[in-house]
């Protein structure tokens, strides 16, 4: 009888231990699975499909002006490209810098320093590389300054515009209704929550929100 009771309690303890292992295993496994799935979805949004990539022409990047504007050689001619859907702090003296400073109360030198950081990030990302340029469907081909308005992709499919926002070096530009605007807004939210890039200790992008874009 004693051996039966002993075996009974040993079985109960074993089952309880297995139940606890199963509970805590699922408790910690599910968030990891969700995190992995979220990361996979982020990568999927951040890349051009391989079949589209193979059919697209590549253009060499010749010069980078700031965090959202660069020059590429197209059909033997250098063209200025303004990346769609994003906006970075101004790096150079300009009327926009004056307006940004007046509107936000941030001094010009601080804004330019933030713009320099965004510029250096983009130089590292696309400098001396070849890129794929895609226009916004049913959108304007050029802006009022004559710059081509484009979505930009690296040869490995990386969506440059989105990556700049995801890494915290640009805001989502909200003034125009673009086909990929929701992706940019969501990327900005993630960058801010994770304090990436200029959303970190510098809090460099927060002043941009006051512009009402």
Residue map of PLM features:
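Extended substrate/cofactor- or partner-recognition/assembly subdomains adjacent to catalytic sites
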Residues: 181-213
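Residue-level signal for secondary-structure boundary elements
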Residues: 134, 172, 196-199
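Electropositive
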Residues: 39-166
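Residue-level "edge-of-site" marker
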Residues: 139, 177, 204
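Conserved beta-structured recognition patch
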Residues: 144-194
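Hydrophobic single-pass membrane-insertion segments
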Residues: 23-37
């Amino acid at each position: 009888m004693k051996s039966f009771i002993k075996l009974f309690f040993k079985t109960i303890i074993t089952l309880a231990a297995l139940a606890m292992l199963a509970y805590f295993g699922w408790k910690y496994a599910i968030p990891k699975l969700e995190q992995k799935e979220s990361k996979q979805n982020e990568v999927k949004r951040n890349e051009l499909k391989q079949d589209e990539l193979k059919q697209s022409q590549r253009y060499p990047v010749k010069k980078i002006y700031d965090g959202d504007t660069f020059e590429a050689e197209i059909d033997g001619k250098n063209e200025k490209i303004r990346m769609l859907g994003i906006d970075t702090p101004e790096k150079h003296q300009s009327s926009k810098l004056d307006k940004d400073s007046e509107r936000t109360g941030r001094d010009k030198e601080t804004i330019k320093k933030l713009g320099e950081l965004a510029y250096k990030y983009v130089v590292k990302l696309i400098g001396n590389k070849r890129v794929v340029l895609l226009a916004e469907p049913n959108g304007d081909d050029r802006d009022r300054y004559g710059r081509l308005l484009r979505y930009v992709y690296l040869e490995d499919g990386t969506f440059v515009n989105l990556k700049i926002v995801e890494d915290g070096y640009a805001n989502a530009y909200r003034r125009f209704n673009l086909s990929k605007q929701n992706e940019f807004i969501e990327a900005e939210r993630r960058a801010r929550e994770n304090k990436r890039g200029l959303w970190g200790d510098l809090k460099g992008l927060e002043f941009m929100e006051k512009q009402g874009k």
